[in-house]
Amino acid sequence: MVSESHHEALAAPPATTVAAALPSNVTEPAAPGGGGGKEDAFSNLKKKFMNELNKIPLPPWALIAIAIVAVLLILTCCFCLCKKCLFKKKNKKKGKEKGGKNAINMKDVKDLGKTMKDQALKDDDAETGLTDGEEKEEPKEVEKLGKIQYSLDYDFQNNQLLVGIIQAAELPALDMGGTSDPYVKVFLLPDKKKKYETKVHRKTLNPVFNEQFTFKVPYSELGGKTLVMAVYDFDRFSKHDIIGEYKVAMNTVDFGHVTEEWRDLQSAEKEEQEKLGDICFSLRYVPTAGKLTVVILEAKNLKKMDVGGLSDPYVKIHLMQNGKRLKKKKTTIKKNTLNPYYNESFSFEVPFEQIQKVQIVVTVLDYDKIGKNDAIGKVFVGYNSTGAELRHWSDMLANPRRPIAQWHTLQPEEEVDAMLAVKK
């Protein structure tokens, strides 16, 4: 006992001495486990997670596989998003670069074009000496209308000008099929009284005519005239289109020999359709009797043909088939009027089987005591007719034994003759 107490007594002072020897600002090291709060929390979460994981009724390898798949899906989504963003940025950058180089605002284009045009005009004006009030004419491209070959000769013995229309070539195509139906009108200016025209050649751009026309003109008067050769495209359903024309001043031609030459067609001046007047007549057909009755009722606003500003009109009626005149009738002459009233009836025998093959041609003429009676205008109904004329003929056939009256606009004689010459 004594020895133990003595032992304790001996051991105590050194402990006190050690404690006193430590500096006052030194902290005593923490006991193990006292400063590991974070590690404990992580351990607890880990234990809970493992406990929850153990509760899932799946083997560990299955859970690992699911985790790997989930990670792969997440990585794939991230990759796609990144790629899409990069692609958009690339396109945007490319678009900006392209826009900066090529895409120009329309307003900028207009302004730039206007500025450049104004500057160019100023430069041109400065070079040519044009003022602001003057305009510089731009050179127009010459339109190719084809060419025509013709011949000219003069018969001094009979005082006749002989005009030959030989052929045309390289005409422009005016029809939808890539061709034209050309014919040529020939007349002398300034009177335009006597007009000729060639036959219509179907579906060709290089027609060969080989036709000759004669004008009775004294040589002393020939020098003041101009020959016009106008090439037209025939159209059954509308006005004929002019392709081009060529004019020859007679005072420039040497009639000491026959002239034959090719010349390029030139653009023709558009002339307004001359108003020739209107005529009213009725048609009546009786199929059982084979009788066709035409009643010429009246005409109005006829073209002035005489010097006094009037005319002496009368009407000719022709029954035609296949270009041949089968019968001819005519009205009385009405003196000094442009609005004659006739009310004259004419009958023709036409069998029922022939009624669809015939034509009634109505021509209004101006009577002249001295010279030839000039045609004012013309119209025809029946086979190969069109428009109002075809409608009138159809109405007559649809209403047998009943007279059908209708007004018709007179057409130039040469145009109607051209239509009559066309065979279907």
UniProtKB/Swiss-Prot annotation:
GO terms for molecular function: calcium ion sensor activity; calcium-dependent phospholipid binding; metal ion binding; SNARE binding. Residues 124-136 have a biased composition (Acidic residues). It is found in: Cytoplasmic vesicle, Secretory vesicle membrane; Cytoplasmic vesicle, Secretory vesicle, Synaptic vesicle membrane; Cytoplasmic vesicle, Secretory vesicle, Chromaffin granule membrane; Cytoplasm. It is a single-pass membrane protein. Its cofactor is Ca(2+). It holds the Pfam family C2. This is Synaptotagmin-1. The keyword Repeat applies. Homotetramer. The chain crosses the membrane at residues 61-82. Its main location: membrane. Residues 83-424 are cytoplasmic. Residues 1-60 are vesicular. Residues 117-142 are annotated as: Disordered. Ca(2+) 5 binds at residues 306, 366, 368, 374. PROSITE patterns: C2.
